[in-house]
């Protein structure tokens, strides 16, 4: 059995350069061709069509769907008053909304494929297209629970501004928080995957449909973590390790549902101690891991 190392394992500049080429090969094989004007990818589109052809709908719709719509953008009711299924879905919306805002800003700031001369530029365009595909999978999760009126809306103006200027930072400044952001996303998905068994215990069909959608996202996100790690030199890696805790806690403070669903302290520990050996083998087989994180 293959063994793995920590995501914070050191790497030489030469190793990182080769890993960018390896990742570029992997992502093209995994995604197919980019459909740039639609922020889509051919193989992801085919996958989505298969999910939609075998769509599952909850046998027990939310008791009060309007409670979801009322609280998904901003929590209007006390989170402790929401049932756990609704709480999970309002959290998922808020989390995905941050993703949508961030990738929308980054898309405008990155060069289109026709102007992308470097491998890292082409990787970034594919990466963002994958993230837009994830947003479409989130939509299918909501439809699983008969929530057909979900729309993505902007964040508060000051937060929108932060997301809009972040992609303009020099790489040395942007790379550590960009890496930690990907690590945070993967941490959320891993904890969410575990929570499904409890929260959706009475709905096995819906639970497994959501889990399949989630694991498609997780396979990509696992690769994104390695890819973003590859942008970090020794100094950037040290900075990233220092900001895991502050970034995680700051992010979750903006999502009031989080502390009612997850152990935030454990999520921080998982981020700081992330090791590929803790990931399920079937997920690792479908994803990409930097060579310097493989023993």
Task: Tell what function each PLM region has.
Residues 1-295:
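Non-heme di-metal
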């Amino acid at each position: 059995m293959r063994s793995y190392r920590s995501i914070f394992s050191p790497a030489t500049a030469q190793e990182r350069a080769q890993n960018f080429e390896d990742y570029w090969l992997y992502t093209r094989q995994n995604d197919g061709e980019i459909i740039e004007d639609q922020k889509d990818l051919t193989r992801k589109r085919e996958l989505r069509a298969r999910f939609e052809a075998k769509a599952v709908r909850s046998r027990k719709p939310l008791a009060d769907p309007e409670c979801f719509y009322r609280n998904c953008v901003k929590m209007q009711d006390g989170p402790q008053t929401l049932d756990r299924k609704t709480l999970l879905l309002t959290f998922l919306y808020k989390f995905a909304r941050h993703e949508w805002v961030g990738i929308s800003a980054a898309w405008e700031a990155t060069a289109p494929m026709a102007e992308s001369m470097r491998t890292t530029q082409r990787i970034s365009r594919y990466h963002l297209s994958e993230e837009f595909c994830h947003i479409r999978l989130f939509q299918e999760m909501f439809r699983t629970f008969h929530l057909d009126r979900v729309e993505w809306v902007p964040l508060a103006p000051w937060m929108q501004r932060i997301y809009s200027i972040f992609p303009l930072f020099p790489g040395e400044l942007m790379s550590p928080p960009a890496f930690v952001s990907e690590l945070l996303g993967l941490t959320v998905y891993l904890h969410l995957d575990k929570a499904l068994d409890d929260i959706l215990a009475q709905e096995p069909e819906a639970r497994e449909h959501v889990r399949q959608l989630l694991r498609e996202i997780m396979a990509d996100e696992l690769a994104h973590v390695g890819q973003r790690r590859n942008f970090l030199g020794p100094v950037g890696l040290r900075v990233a390790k220092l900001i895991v805790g502050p970034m995680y806690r700051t992010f979750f403070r903006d999502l009031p549902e989080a502390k009612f669903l997850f152990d935030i302290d454990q999520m921080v520990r998982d981020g700081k101690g992330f090791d590929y050996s803790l990931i399920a083998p079937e997920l690792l087989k479908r994803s990409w891991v930097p060579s310097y994180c493989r023993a």
